[in-house]
Amino acid sequence: MVRILLKKTGRGFVLKNSMTPHITQIKVNKSIEILKVPVSKHPKGYNDHIGFDVDERLIKKILIMRYQKVSITTIQSKNDLDKLVLRKPDLVFSGVKYFNFKKEKIWLNDFLKQNNISHITSSAKDLQSESNKSIAKDIIRKAKIITANSLVVYANKMPKSFALPMPFPVFVKPLIGGNSKGVDEHSVVTNSTELKKKIKDIQKKYNCASIVETYLRGKEYTVGIMQDTVTGNLIALPAEIIIEKNKQGQRILDFKMKKENTEELIKVSDIKLFNVLADMAKKSFTALKGRSIGRIDIRMNENFIPHFIEANLMPGLRGGYFYRCCNLNLNINYQEMILRIVNNGLTLSKI
C-alpha cells in the first residue's frame, strides 16, 4: 500500500512532502463522496447537527490512493441531496448528523440508507439517544450496565428548594453536547447555591437543561470501538486519560483542557482492567445500537468500580481520542485508520 506521510498538528494532520517514488497501484472500483461540513452561523454555540468535522482535502488524498473515484461535495439544499442520490456513490463519508432545509429535518444516514447508499456511522434514532445524556444513561441502566445516579434539571423549572436523589458533591454538565463543552472548574458542586448557579450558567450559555449526577472520584478512561469488517464483531480500544489536578485538587476533563490538548492518553497495560473496560464499552455500544465506530467514556468511583459516563457514536476523526485509541491499541497510523473506517462502511452494509 502506498503511504501518505502525515505530520501531527494541534487539530489533526497535514501532508508532508515525500520522496517516495510513484508506485502504480490497482484501485478499488468504488466511488466515495466526502461531504463538506456546513459552516456554522453560530460558531460559539453547540452545533447539534454536526457529529464531527474533518479535513476533507486530506481525507480525499488518503482515499484516492485506494479508490477509483473520490470527490468532495457541499450540501446546501435538499436538491443537492437529491442530486447526490442520482450519482449513486458507493459510500458517503460525513460527520453530519442531519440537515435543516426550510424547516424540514433530514437525518443524513437514514436518508442514505433509504437510498441504498453506504455510510460510516449510526442511524438517526441511535444518534439522538446518544446525544441526550439522560436517554443514553436510561438505555445503559436497562442493559444492566453501571452508571452514576442522575437527574435532569431545567433552569426555568427549578424550584427554590429541591432534594437531590444523591448526596453532594455532584457533577453538573449540559444535557446535550460533547467535547466537554460546559464542563469547567465549577462543574463539581458541593451545595445548593453552587448547583443553582451552575445550572443557570449552562442554560444561559448552551440553552439546554443540565444533567446532575453522582460525582465519581476515580480515574477516567475512553474506549474506542471499531467493528470487524468481516464478522461485524466489536474491537475495543481502551486508553487511560491522564488529567492534571485543577485548583480545587480535582481531576476534571474540562473543555479548556480538551481545547488546549493538555491531557494525555496512555495504553491500559493491566490485562484484567483492559478486559473490564473492553467488556463494559462493547456492551454499552451494543445497547446504544452503535454502528461501525464509536467511543465510550468510563470513570471509576472511589471503590474502583467502573461507571459508564457517556457515549459518542460519531467520534471525532482528526487527531483526537478515537485516533489515539486506535494508534495505542492497533499500532496503526491515521491513514490506516481512515481506510479501515471506509472499508467498514462499505462492508457492514452487507452484514
Which residues are covered by each model-predicted region?
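Phosphate-binding site of ATP-dependent enzymes
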Residues: 192-273, 279, 300, 305-307
